[in-house]
């Protein structure tokens, strides 16, 4: 692989000057698409501010090596763009770093000259996803501001990582499932299998249930949700002899990867412990790191963020329970499944935040959309039909993207 270190000879400011074309692409996307679909200027301003984040994260807020896998994606995209690694070879080779790099290499950007370059690639995906959700009328006032201001999302969508791709494919899989467009939903969940198979196995049964129970039109129903939960619990108990060794393997691997010693990890020894650990670790995974567990500036910031996010989740869930418990039940199943799966195997606080934010974002987006959550505090019931003077787009006035 060719030497990429030449960029460091240009210093801090020189490195960032090379990224100005990428910044311009992102800003032009906001201006052109925002103008076409008459997106309110306050949303466009926040998106434009997001475009500046790649400049002020790596080697400003923290060292690039703090999340060292950024170098691997940077090198992977460069290898593909330079022809040292074939695109098909990267996509089919089995290494999910190269598979994610192959997908990023398709984006209309200059070659990534520094580790911060892919932050603009991911910012581009973040902006594209925003406009798709906006034009498809997925957003409510609550979810649109959560999307724009969620700190973890702002952080990870501006770094040179695969997390934005994961979020992008997961959200669009659900979007097309809600529209009963099976082929498009499958099209977006397949790349997810390549770059993050855990999320694929979390999302696939959820999407399948969405189609089977016609959740978009009928909701899940509390009785169905309880029945599915009991069946799932029974299935876990029956599968315990097979599942426990695999879970222990991943628990140990993740613990060692995060700097622990294999002999210090507490392994799951029985079916009862498996179920209890899954339930309790799911709640802990959603909440950590707590303030007293934070060790360093970034974990401390993330612990304060957790308090805010948990409060928002509580308010959204409470309002959804009051308005549409049948629709809420489905997304509570999604949240319980996803948090429990990762809670069993993830120990590092930073890793937990990184893996958790796409799942939290999906919950907020689609609980607000399916339960029509437009405010967190008012008890007044609003009709589903939007008012003519509402900020968000009306389907009768705006064309839709990728329908």
Predicted regions, residues:
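Transmembrane-helix motifs of polytopic, lipid-linked glycan transferases
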Residues: 28-33, 120-139, 311-315
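Loop-to-helix entry region of an early transmembrane alpha helix in multi-pass inner-membrane enzymes
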Residues: 110-128, 303
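Membrane-interface transmembrane helices that cradle and orient dolichyl/undecaprenyl
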Residues: 133-138, 171-184
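Short hydrophobic/aromatic helix or loop-helix immediately within or flanking a transmembrane segment
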Residues: 68-113, 280-281, 285
């Amino acid at each position: 692989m060719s030497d990429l270190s030449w960029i460091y000879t240009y210093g801090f400011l020189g490195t960032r000057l090379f990224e100005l074309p990428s910044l311009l692409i992102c800003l032009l996307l906001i201006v052109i698409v925002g103008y076409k679909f008459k997106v309110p200027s306050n949303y466009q301003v926040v998106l434009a501010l997001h475009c500046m984040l790649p400049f002020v994260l790596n080697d400003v807020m923290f060292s690039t090596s703090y999340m060292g896998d950024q170098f691997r994606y940077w090198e992977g995209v460069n290898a593909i763009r330079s022809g040292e690694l074939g695109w098909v070879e990267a996509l089919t080779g089995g290494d999910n770093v190269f598979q994610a790099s192959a997908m990023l290499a398709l984006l209309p950007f200059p070659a990534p000259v520094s580790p911060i370059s892919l932050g603009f690639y991911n910012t581009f995906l973040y902006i594209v996803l925003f406009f798709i959700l906006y034009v498809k009328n997925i957003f409510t006032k609550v979810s649109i501001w959560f999307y724009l201001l969620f700190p973890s999302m702002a952080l990870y969508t501006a770094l040179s990582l695969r997390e934005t791709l994961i979020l992008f494919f997961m959200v669009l899989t659900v979007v097309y499932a809600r529209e009963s467009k099976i082929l498009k939903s499958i099209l977006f969940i397949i790349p997810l299998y390549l770059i993050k198979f855990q999320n694929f196995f979390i999302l696939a049964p959820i999407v399948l249930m969405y189609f089977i129970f016609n959740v978009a039109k009928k909701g899940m129903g509390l009785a169905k949700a309880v029945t599915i939960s009991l069946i799932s619990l029974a299935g876990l108990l029956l599968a315990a002899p097979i599942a426990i060794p695999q879970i222990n393997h991943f628990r140990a691997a993740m613990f060692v990867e995060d700097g622990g010693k294999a002999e210090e990890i507490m392994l799951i020894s029985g079916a009862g412990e498996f179920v209890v650990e899954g339930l309790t670790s799911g709640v802990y995974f959603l909440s950590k790191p707590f303030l007293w567990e934070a060790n360093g500036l970034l974990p401390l910031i993330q612990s304060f963020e957790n308090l805010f996010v948990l409060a928002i989740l509580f308010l959204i869930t409470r309002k959804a329970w009051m308005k549409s418990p049948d629709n809420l039940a489905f997304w509570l199943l999604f949240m319980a499944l996803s948090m429990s799966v990762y809670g069993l195997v993830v120990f590092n606080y930073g890793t937990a935040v990184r893996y958790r934010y796409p799942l939290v974002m999906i919950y907020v987006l689609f609980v607000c959309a399916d339960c029509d959550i437009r405010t967190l505090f008012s008890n007044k019931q609003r009709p589903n039909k939007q008012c003519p003077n509402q900020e968000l787009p009306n389907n009768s006035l705006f064309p839709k993207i990728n329908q």
